């Protein structure tokens, strides 16, 4: 079974590195959802030899994913991580705000 994964903060350095790691491990791009702020909506991020389109976090449906990797900073995590968790999504937050 493949997990559907949201990379929240996909346009930042850590988010791009997470995309690189998943691509290097041959994860299917159809299971990856790059997410960022509304100002980044529609931009493209590299995923191996493919480009994925970034979705705005305020329009993204957390029910689409099984796992969300947050690397967008404490304020984003504080606001959005609980909403992802409420949709039965596993949340891994690198901001440490929820510790």
Task: Name these PLM-found stretches.
Residues 1-97:
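N-terminal Rossmann-like NAD(P) cofactor-binding subdomain of oxidoreductases
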């Amino acid at each position: 079974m493949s997990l559907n994964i949201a990379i929240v903060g996909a346009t930042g350095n850590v988010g791009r590195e997470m995309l690189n790691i998943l691509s290097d491990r041959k994860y299917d791009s159809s299971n990856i959802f790059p997410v960022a702020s509304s100002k980044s909506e529609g931009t493209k991020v590299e995923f191996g030899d493919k480009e994925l389109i970034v979705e705005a976090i305020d329009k993204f449906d957390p029910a689409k994913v099984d796992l969300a990797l947050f690397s967008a900073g404490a304020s984003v995590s504080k606001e959005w991580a609980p909403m992802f968790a409420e949709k039965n999504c596993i949340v891994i937050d690198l901001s440490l705000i929820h510790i």
